[in-house]
From Swiss-Prot:
It holds the Pfam family PPR_3. One of its GO terms (cellular component) is ribonucleoprotein complex. This is Small ribosomal subunit protein mL104 (rPPR9). It comes from the Eukaryota. The gene is PNM1. The keyword Transmembrane helix does not apply. RNA-binding protein that functions in both mitochondrion and nucleus. In mitochondrion, it is associated with polysomes and may play a role in translation. Required during embryogenesis. In nucleus, might be involved in the regulation of its own gene expression. Residues 480-495 have a biased composition (Basic and acidic residues). Disruption phenotype: Embryo-lethal at a early stage of development. It comes from Arabidopsis thaliana. Expressed in root tips, lateral root primordia and leaf primordia. Highly detected in the mature pollen grains. Its main location: mitochondrion.
Amino acid sequence: MPPSLPSLQLRRLLLRSFISSSSVNTLQSQPRIISSKPLFSPLPPSRSSIFSTFPSRFFSSETNAESESLDSNEIALSFSKELTGNPDAESQTISQRFNLSFSHITPNPDLILQTLNLSPEAGRAALGFNEWLDSNSNFSHTDETVSFFVDYFGRRKDFKGMLEIISKYKGIAGGKTLESAIDRLVRAGRPKQVTDFFEKMENDYGLKRDKESLTLVVKKLCEKGHASIAEKMVKNTANEIFPDENICDLLISGWCIAEKLDEATRLAGEMSRGGFEIGTKAYNMMLDCVCKLCRKKDPFKLQPEVEKVLLEMEFRGVPRNTETFNVLINNLCKIRRTEEAMTLFGRMGEWGCQPDAETYLVLIRSLYQAARIGEGDEMIDKMKSAGYGELLNKKEYYGFLKILCGIERLEHAMSVFKSMKANGCKPGIKTYDLLMGKMCANNQLTRANGLYKEAAKKGIAVSPKEYRVDPRFMKKKTKEVDSNVKKRETLPEKTARKKKRLKQINMSFVKKPHNKMRRRM
């Protein structure tokens, strides 16, 4: 058949063009040409096998293009769905599923962190995710990525899995991994396990035991008030790692956080006898501890007890710094002694100290709480002129607005809200929700709706809620009086009615002239 030869040659040319071309457009256009001519004879079996591979090549290139355009958040969500879909599955099966579904994706640290944060219920399925990462040739673990898994298992209090991860990456785990492990153990309330981990971490997990790691462990323990265990650990390792002044200051702060002032003074005495200098940081911690104990037991003893600590600082030649004044001002404001705090604020320059951002923020909150609104606004202006205006973020403004709404100063809260926006600070969901709730409580629904529309225009997703109106601001409903029901007279009304009736009776006995007599007259 003569027409069959050109058709076969044309098909072979088309097949060569399919094989040589790699773009998606040629792959989409050529099948249309073939299907548009029904006169062509069918391909031989050998050629059909080659042509049958084209759809798979087309779809794989399409998925690669899509995977490059996908956002990292969407990829993390798909990873999380895969992990939480079957959390009881074995790690090998999870790794195989990831190889089948996500072989075209190259993981990075941000993607791993997002996936683990979105999958709190995955549990041990995260080990399968970790195996898939190990099998991926384009990825290699670092100290940071290992710390992500350590933090994940520690957050779930699965410390067995956490230790498995650390021992698996013995040569890779470093300072970040150690910090995550210690932090999770301390926050879980296992200080003894922390000391055991520190003793054998160099042999079992390849983590260095040096002064830096000891300082980290002591700091984490003392932040949660486990100063006794931290002090024992420091004394046991003193022959290997001799403590410095920083470690001693951390131990004093740990005793002060636990509100054990006697132990803190004992340790300070041992430090001074051992040749260590007690610095301003240690005295500030003891001063804060004294203020806390006085606030709890007897606030009137605050001033004499504070003076004792300050006199000891002067006797030992320890200078005051800004943190010293911040401790005093903060504790005075907590017991509503704002006037004394303002006096102390004015005397900071006598000791060569300048207020910082924390000083201004504490005083602004205290002044607003005391309803000294004008002075609070002046303090905000002073803070800006001192160069700390950038630290007035939406979190701090939210605290100011919450205080003003709490003392029923809604109008001033709205003026602070306007100045917040004028300074370039964008309010968030909590700020709008707070003001809308207060306006609805004051029965100002129109203004609340205006705020809701403003938030919607800015793209802030404020969810509408049911706000209760304060009964003080509700309009009192007038009771409808039924005219058929006889109203009970009051005593003045009854007296007036009796007087009127008596007058009528008295006037009835008076003889009145006739009309004819009036006309004659």
